[in-house]
């Protein structure tokens, strides 16, 4: 099952209530604390990391620079600096720190 982190949290609850926990591979998108914890404990198979705090910080810096200097920063993709292209797995989950609770 693939979906946003919040949806995968619901799938975890539904599978658990149905007595089918662990019967599906769960892959989220967002990099929430719930996702990172789920990948760590094996409840989730993987997650595609999102970095909303980092993105917001970079955006604000670029905006202030543009206002002060009139210079555009161009496209900024914080995902290019993420380990393993942002794919969180059991093998690399320790490289990621959630930026939101989810």
Give the predicted meaning of each segment.
Residues 1-37:
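Hydrophobic alpha-helical
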Residues 35-39, 56-59:
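Short, charged, surface-exposed secondary-structure boundary motifs
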């Amino acid at each position: 099952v693939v979906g946003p982190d919040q949806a995968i949290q619901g799938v975890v609850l539904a599978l658990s209530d149905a007595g089918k926990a662990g019967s599906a591979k769960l892959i989220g998108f967002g990099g929430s604390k719930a996702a990172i914890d789920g990948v760590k404990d094996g409840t989730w198979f993987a997650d595609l990391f999102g970095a909303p705090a980092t993105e917001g910080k970079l955006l604000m810096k670029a905006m202030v620079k543009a206002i002060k200097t009139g210079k555009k920063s161009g496209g900024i993709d914080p995902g290019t600096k993420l380990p393993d292209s942002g794919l969180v797995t059991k093998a690399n989950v320790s490289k990621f720190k959630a930026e939101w609770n989810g």
